Regions:
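Histidine- and/or cysteine-centered catalytic micro-motif in compact active-site loops
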Residues: 34-36, 45-48, 82
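C-terminal binding/interaction regions
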Residues: 2-21, 63, 71-147
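Hydrophobic "anchor" residues
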Residues: 39-40
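Active-site cofactor/substrate anionic-group-binding motifs, chiefly glycine-
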Residues: 56, 60, 65-68
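Short, surface-exposed helix-loop/turn micro-motifs enriched in polar/charged residues
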Residues: 23-25, 53
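Compact, glycine-rich, soluble single-domain proteins
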Residues: 45-59
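Short beta-strand scaffold segments in enzyme catalytic cores
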Residues: 25-36
């Protein structure tokens, strides 16, 4: 079993779409992240009808990672609905998730997202966001740490 299959199976265990209330639904998108140390953390989405409350599965998994381990660096992420990512975009993160990953740790630009599970095609966050607005500030911080 490769790491992608392991991530897929961990996330798939959470998939169980449900209406939490008349206004909130959850578990229709699931995700698993592999942290820098190899631990796997999972999450599922929750959405409210007012639009203010929306937590993507990727960010839920990242919150779990940080809460449970204090880690900020990610190696891999898989996110999907009822089947593994396929084609050219079914598993791609939204803009808020991309931004959060870079703000959490600029090194996350190297993490891989699963694009097509069957072929194992991946893309890096840096490829998705080549001109991130915070890059200069992140480099300055990295350089201070290396002095």
């Amino acid at each position: 079993m490769d790491i992608w299959e392991k991530l897929y199976l961990e996330a798939k265990a959470l998939y169980a779409p449900q209406e939490v209330s008349d206004f909130v639904y959850a578990r229709h998108v699931v995700a698993a992240v592999e942290a820098a140390d190899g631990q796997i953390f999972t999450g599922f989405c929750m959405e409210g009808t007012c639009g203010v409350f929306h937590l993507c599965a990727e960010r839920a998994a990242l919150f779990n990672m940080y809460q449970q381990s204090g880690q900020t660096k990610v190696k891999r992420i898989i996110a999907f609905r009822d089947k593994p990512p396929y084609g050219e975009g079914s598993g791609m993160p939204c803009g808020a998730c991309r931004e959060f990953l870079l703000e959490l740790d600029a090194e996350n630009r190297h993490l891989e997202f699963m694009v097509d599970y069957e072929s194992r095609k991946t893309i890096t966050l840096g490829e998705l966001m080549p001109l991130w607005w915070g890059e200069e500030q992140a480099r300055q911080r990295e350089n201070k740490g290396n002095e």
